Amino acid sequence: MTVFDIFTSSTFFTSPFPLTVGILSISLSGVLWYLRRAKAPTQADAPPVYPFDPTTLDRKECKPPILTFGNSMILPNRYAHEIRNNDLLSFRDGLEKDFLTTVPGLEALFTGTFHNDIVWDTASAFSRKIGLLIEPLSTETGIFLQENWSEDTEWHTIPLNESMQFLIAQLTARIFVGNELCRNRDWIQLALGYTANRAAAIKELHQYGRLIPIVHWFLPSCRALRACVRNARPLVEGILNTHRKKHQGEQKEESLDALSWIDGVAGETGVKYDPTLTQLRLAYAAVHTTSDMMTKVLAAICEHDELVKPLREEIVAVVKEHGWTEAALAKMLLLDSVLKETQRLEPLASFTLSRIAREGVTLNDGTRVPKGTQARLTTDNMWNSGIYPEAARFDGYRFVKLRDQDTATGASSGGLSFVSVSANHMGFGYGKHACPGRFFAGAETKIALCHILLKYDLELVDRELAGAKTDGMMIWRDKRAMLRVKRRSDDIGLEF
């Protein structure tokens, strides 16, 4: 029964129970509102906004300052090598503080050893299966575009970010939960709803500090989050039971969907786990990050439309020689460079490597990180002209040219691919906790971009509206941005 139901009940004023509940609800709501105002972070307590205006991006300072706010430290990139694998600076404690992983509904991120390890193991295992995943990802992309972008050869508009969220939700569902759910609108809406409500809930809850264990029961975003989990259970468990019955007594085959693969690992090890929370965690991680990347790279390509023709030519030439294979994706060097350059200028956030000091830590130059302090690292090297000439300028060929330089000098260019990580490019993190799903995400984005570029002409409706923006440490493209698209009439001559 909701508060509204209680207030509108015919027995509200005659029965003591609903009257008491109603009065308590009103009182508690007022108290929480007052405490939220009292606990609202001041400007001094808020994380500093890192410069993002292109004119201020070029960070040439040799020693950027250490910034502090509240119980947190923002460390310059020069500490990357010390921070990345220091076990006294806890990655998991940082996750728990940032993402409030003990709150019901948010626990999909952090539910016991198996749940944490299996998500990383799944990402690693499926990264080794990319060659087998190309066909289903390509097929699913084609289906999505035909149904949502249409075959219309006249210009028509689509919401850029929303379209990318639905696309990535469908592609990842194909690999994570299989054919049965990847086009199921209920599952897609639940995955997207969980993603959106999770972000909203975390942002709201952080305003309440020590009141979080109470407040989360009443916030609409938290209640919506828990509803997503409840509604997802019959879908996930129904498909999983079908898979189990289908394969009962059969010789085990290698699974191409994460749902069956994880269930198989759990069965072999005798571990009990929550399939629904595991799938929602996978869906959130993939949709939130990869749809953001797709939104940014499509906007960047539209802003630099001189790249469209050479990108199409590269895709056609590579696929004609190598077919739709993992080797073909690796040979698309310009596409890879455009992705990496987009991520260099517009990473998901301007801070990374969030850690909590389990003990006091002294860095090599004497800088002290006190016990309990949350340390984050800036991504300022990505915007430094001493490392990337004319760092504030988007250059789609930047990493192609750097590869050519390495080839000419006999140096290794392994650190220049989209999925590689280094202290100078931390779009996927750095060190042993770098994103394990980046290889899958890289293949997924390339396949989707190949379909889009070869099949459609596209342009931004409003370039100014679609420009890069910041919200605290987050960097994003305006969700109101619209694309104009039309189906190309050219005979591409390539089979997907």
Swiss-Prot record:
GO biological process: secondary metabolic process
Compartment(s) where it occurs, according to its Swiss-Prot or TrEMBL record: Membrane
Highest taxon above the source species: Eukaryota
Entry EC number(s): 1.-.-.-
A Pfam cross-reference name: p450
GO CC annotation terms, alphabetical: membrane
Gene3D superfamilies assigned: Cytochrome P450
Role according to the record: Cytochrome P450 monooxygenase; part of the cluster A that mediates the biosynthesis of chevalone E and its oxidized derivatives that possess a unique five-membered lactone ring and can synergistically enhance the cytotoxicity of doxorubicin (DOX) in breast cancer cells.
UniProt family annotation: Belongs to the cytochrome P450 family.
Name used for this protein in its record: Cytochrome P450 monooxygenase cle4
Organism: Aspergillus versicolor
Lineage: Eukaryota, Fungi, Dikarya, Ascomycota, Pezizomycotina
Gene name for this UniProt entry: cle4
